[in-house]
Amino acid sequence: MMAEDIIVKGKDVTVSFINKIGNRKEKKTVLEGLDFDVQRGEILGLAGESGSGKSTLAKAILGMVPLERGSIESKAENPQMIFQDPYSSLNPAKTISWIMQEPLKLGKKKYTGSERLAKVEEMLGEVGLDAGYMQRKPGELSGGQRQRICIGTALMQAPELLIADEPVSALDVTIQAQVLELMREIHRKKKLTILFISHDLRTMYNFCDRVMILQKGRIVECGKPEDIYSDPKEPYTRLLLESAGIV
């Protein structure tokens, strides 16, 4: 693999937090000694049980949590994150137009008000919604519509890396499929790199180019889903697959 094919590279990535228990302080290591890479243009799935460190790794890539040890090198311009809960991710007091314009106001490039509105309308079309949604507020939308708004808002600054943290787990099954298809289409059109965090290994099989398995803050397996699912090397991976009814 050529160096230019790697958009994010982690070496010995270690993250710890200090917990206070009464008068006592206790260090908890959440990620320990991770070596990994994210290839440009791929969809990399990050799987593991709750508490395995998936969300912490995503935040570390974005520089949202400090590293105790190691390094993360990122070549991604304007990386963005989509969160699990579309209900709490959007300001309920603001219109969709206001919400989606905010990233443009914060970016380096300056836009006029009419240019921002045009970009919002264009992005709404890309996520399968029309201009009629611009003056609505989040409380007027369904969960699937809200998540489409979250995706569109994340795309407003043309990110090279999109981190999706359990983006469909709060949605009904039929809506999950629609949102995943939207993300797949956006990935194809925009040649995005996506880090897809989920506990749903079934979804990852058809959606991801590679899957990385985390257990207690360590990477235990990484590879193409068809290889990992047909011949898991680690007992923990097999346990996850059995729990999902895959093996």
Stretches found by the model and what they are:
Residues 156-160:
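A short, proline-enriched helix->beta-strand linker immediately N-terminal to the Walker B motif
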Residues 222-223:
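ABC ATPase "signature
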Residues 114-132, 241-242:
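Conserved ABC ATPase "signature" region
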Residues 137-141, 145:
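Conserved ABC ATPase signature
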Residues 47-49:
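The feature captures the beta-strand-to-loop junction immediately N-terminal to the Walker
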Residues 204-206:
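A short, surface-exposed alpha-helical micro-motif characterized by mixed small hydrophobic
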